[in-house]
Structure formats: structure tokens, C-alpha cells
Amino acid sequence: MTAALPSTLELLKDVHLGLPVPCHDPARLALLSGHYLYYHYGCDGLDDRGWGCGYRTLQTLCSWPGGQSSGVPGLPALQGALEAMGDKPPGFRGSRNWIGCVEASLCLEHFGGPQGRLCHLPRGVGLRGEEERLYSHFTTGGGPVMVGGDADAQSKALLGICEGPGSEVYVLILDPHYWGTPKNRCELQAAGWVGWQKVKSVFDSNSFYNLCFTRNL
């Protein structure tokens, strides 16, 4: 049996800082503006493994741009808001049902967080054709971008995009599926919980995807 985590953990800020670029002499590189906190499985003492990745990614979005936990709703509050809005049926609060980008955008508006703008990528497209949108987003003050799909239902956040000299495209991924008490960002980087990945290896051709872009109101 895995030991329970403490009820409150010290959340780490801007855990991508210090990562090297994914290729030598990149043609283009764009990173998010502002600051964020890394929310992950169990970071508030609630064992949400297997269903909470969307909520944790949403909490990371809510912590932007100041990188502060004040005002970031907990999982019960997020579920209660979705139930109160009529997006989810009675009894959703306290369940282990996951959420995606559509629910995240509703919660961002409900709680007065950063603005969430949705983008749908059809099955088989991957990120093809959206690289320019991401470059524009990150170079004009945009925050983290939540990603989720159907066949690939593991929510994650995009923090940046990079194009190599040979036209290979990479995205900077923040993975909320970590369980434990991270000591520092170097530990997370070494284990791959935040890092650059090739677009073609991240996006499943059998899945559609939704993206939720965050911006200041």
C-alpha cells in the first residue's frame, strides 16, 4: 500500500526553468509568460490517481499568471461549480469522474480566473496546423495551454513550443500525473515530469484533442 501524502504540500513554481532547449540552434522558440504552480496527483492530500489529471492541470492554469495558490479552487469546489452550472448531474461533487478542456474553460470563467479559449483538433490531425497558433499565443503573453483528448485522455499542459533547424517541432509538456513530494524542479525535470517532447510522439493519431488557451482578461 502506498503511503498517503501530507494534506498540504509546498507547491513548486515554474518547474520548467533551467531546462535546455531540445535541439541545437533552434529556428524558433516561444515560452509562456508569467508564473504558475505545479499541481499534480495528491498535492493537497487527496488521492486522485487515475482520474484527477484534468483537475490538476486546471489548477495549474488557475495559478497563472501570478504563480500563487490563493484563489485556486480545490477539487470539491471545481466539481461543485460544474454541478451548480448544470454541466454535470447532481451527485457529481465527490465523484471520481474526470474532466477535460471544455469543463476547464467553464470553471475558469466561473471562478474569475484567466480567460480560457477552446480549440478542437479533429482525430488524426494531431497538432498539425496549430503550431502557428501556439507560437502566436506564447509570444503575445499567453499562459499554459491545457490539452486533452478521447483515445488519449491524459490531460497535460503545454508551456512552450520550439522548432528545430530541420523543421522538427517540440512542445514543452507539464505532466500532472506525478505522485509524491517533489523536492525541487531538477528532480521533476530529471524524471521527465516536465520536459520537451517531439510533437509527433506526443499526439496520438487515433485521438481527437481539445486545447484550452489561457490569457489574461
From Swiss-Prot:
Sorted UniProt keywords: Cytoplasm, Hydrolase, Protease, Thiol protease, Ubl conjugation pathway
Active site residues according to the UniProt entry: 53, 175, 177
GO cellular component: a single term: cytosol
Subcellular location: Cytoplasm, Cytosol
Enzyme class label: hydrolase
Expression (tissue specificity): Widely expressed. Expressed at higher level in brain, heart, kidney and skeletal muscle.
GO biological process terms on file: protein maturation; proteolysis
EC number(s) from the headed UniProt entry: 3.4.22.-
PANTHER family: INACTIVE UFM1-SPECIFIC PROTEASE 1, UFM1-SPECIFIC PROTEASE 2
Chain's role: Thiol-dependent isopeptidase that specifically mediate the processing of UFM1 precursors as well as the deconjugation of UFM1 from target proteins. Mainly responsible for the maturation of the UFM1 precursor, a prerequisite for conjugation reactions.
Family of the protein in this entry: Belongs to the peptidase C78 family.
Name of the protein in its database record: Ufm1-specific protease 1
Biological source species: Mus musculus (Mouse)
Protein's gene: Ufsp1
